[in-house]
Every structure is written in C-alpha cells, then in structure tokens.
Amino acid sequence: IAAGKDLTVGTTKGQLNIAGLRNTFTGYISKGKLDELQTTLNFMEKQQVQYDQEIANIKLDIRALEAKFPRGGSFFRKRIILSEEYFNQNPSDKIAYDSLRQKLAFSEKQLEKIKFDIQATNESIKLIQNPAAGHEHKSAVLSGQNINLLSAQGINIESAKIEASKQANLQAAGLLPVVSEEDAKQGEMRSAINIGGLFDTYEYGQRSSNNYAYMIFNQPSEIYGEMGVNIFAPGQSADSRIVINASDIISDSGKVTLKSYGDLSLTAGQGELYTYNKHSYTKRSGKLKIKKKTITEIKEYNNVKPDASLLSGGKGLDIQSGGNIYAYATLFDAPKGSINLTASKALKLFAVEELNYNKLESHKKSSFLGITYNKENSSNSKKMHTALPSKLVAEAVNTRSGWDTLLEGTEFKTSLEGATIQAGVGENA
C-alpha cells in the first residue's frame, strides 16, 4: 500500500496483522538471493582488506614502541625485556603498549570471524545456484508520510516494510491472542506488539542421502520513520509486552521511542547453513591392478549465525519498560544522540552464540584379491564458537533498572558523556 500523504490503518475490535506472502517452490533457483549474497560477500571482503591493513599498522606501531625497550640476551640473539622497572619509569609506554596489544587481539579476532563468514557466504553462493525446494517470502510494504498503525487489541507484523517519510507510529491498546501450548514451551509469551521476520528456506537433496544441504535466511521486518518511530504498548497488563525479533527499527533524522507497560524483548533470529557430502572412489595398483584401495570421504559443514535486531535513531533511542528489558545481540545505534534504557524491573543485555563447524573424515580400505589387509581412518574437525554481543553506539549511554542489570559481552562505544549504568532505582528498587 502506497499513500501519497498520511496512512492510518486501525482496528476497533480485533488485532492488526501485517505479514509477508509465502511462496513455496521446488526446482527453483533464486536470482534475488544470489544477488543479495554476492553483495554481502563483496562487503565482507572489503572488511577483510581493512582489517588486514589495520593489523599490519598496529604491528608496525608495536615494533616502533618495542625499539625503545631495553634489550638482553646474547650478542647473536637479542631479546626485548619488558621489565616492571622500565614501565614504572615510563608509564606512558606501558599504557601505549597495553593499548596496542588489546587493539591487535581485537582486530585479529574480528578478522578470524570475517574469514569464517566469508567461507559461509561462499558456500551459500555455490548452493543457491542449484535448484532447491523450500519457500521464500515477499514482504508486505506500507509507505506514506505519517504512518499510524493502531489496534484495539494487538499488532502483529511479520516480514513487512513500513516506510514513513515523516513519522511511523504504532500503538496497541490490547493484546494479541494467547500463545499456543507448543509455542509457550519454546519460551514465547503473550504480547501486545510483535514485530518479527519470517524464514526463507532452501533445501537440496534428501535427508540421509550422500549429498544433502539446506540454508535458512531471516527475512526481517523493517520499520522506518525519517523524523521518528514511536512504538507504544500502554495497556495496563503484565502481558502488554513489545517483542522485536530479528528486525530493524530506524529513524535517520529523529528518535526511536519504545514504551511498554510489560516486558520489552529484543531477540535474535537464527540463520543457518548445513552441507553434507559423502563420496567414495577406488584406486588400483600393481602390474595387474589387483591391489585395490577404496577411499570414502565425508565432508560436513555447519554455520549457525544469529540475526540481531537493530535500533537506530539519528537523535537517540529512548526505551522504557514497566517490566523487564531483555536484549539479545541487539545493536543500539545513536552515534549523534543518547541511548536511554529504563526498566522498572531487570535490565539484561545478552550475547548470542555463533557456531562454525567444519569436519572432514577419510576412510581407506586396502585389499588384495578381495581380501582386506589394511584399514585407515582419519578425522579432522574445527569448531569455532563466538558470541555476538549487544552493542551500544552513542554520544552517551544511560541504563537504569529497578532490579538487576546484566551485561553479557556487551560493547559500549560513546563519544561524549560515556555510559551511566544504574541498578536498584525506581519504584521496584
């Protein structure tokens, strides 16, 4: 729906649903997803070059600083002496040296992660060019100047794009339906406003066959208001929650404001790539080719990556909850404004794990005239677990909670006042 001026969509009795359309297919090659993956790969390869250069520059700075350090050892094997006495006499060198070492460790860790991501994206590009079975979603799109989504009950948005040239306003006076027993077992709870993505899936081959693979990508919801985004759940119920899952809430020139009477949850989705390939071949040797070696190779690859939510406000972020605030690997971005997180109860920012697993097995069986005389088995695997943290980028960051504040692997980047974190404040302290 495209409106030249303002657009208001509302319900007076039931809930408001806005969702993408699902397209199921077999034998389909997704040109759109291929282009998207190629764009992602190009971006990551540029990042890799930047980190390579950054690491090289840091190492040069470290060597330049180390040239000032005292030396010891033999004439032929000089070595640097990092003595406590030297650093006590030159505290600025100690600070500079420690800082450079920390920067180097961080950059090397980021480079390793980017290399794994590039590997996963290359694998995805290879796969996506083959016919697949699965489904994709076409996002629902609403555009206008001021967009108002109002509901007497709840608001449910799945894989939709809301684009307002002025403000985007969402308000739910009531609640969405009670979640099913199965969903409740998965940790889902009733809410007033739910904003999330839908999964696109691509499957290749049959399970338990020698060649099998699948890919899962999140198709997020995106809510954009140039002059501001306001999302309110004011209903006086503990279930009056706002849940944002693997989606983007953005205002380039305004503020993003989220307020809920109940809990406010910012959760991450999960993209995944899995491939399995089993291949056997035979080598013969000897004058009569009567010696036979049968080789079976099994390659298995799995990449599981969280799809985080993004909250970005040109003039800041104001997030308030009458209950708890839970954020999983969320990016809070307000480089020219402040970030305010206020929870009447607990405030918890979690990291979410990413998995990269690579395994190669080789089984060799040697035989002569049909009699097996030797077997060799080898296995080489590499597993990398990393945690994608919640990240806050702003001129100032202020967090307040009535109960506990938990910051798990959280990254802060502030340019002016820094970060203010308070626990045990407000009426629930």
What annotation goes with each model-predicted range?
Residues 1-429:
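Low-complexity, glycine- and small/polar-enriched segments
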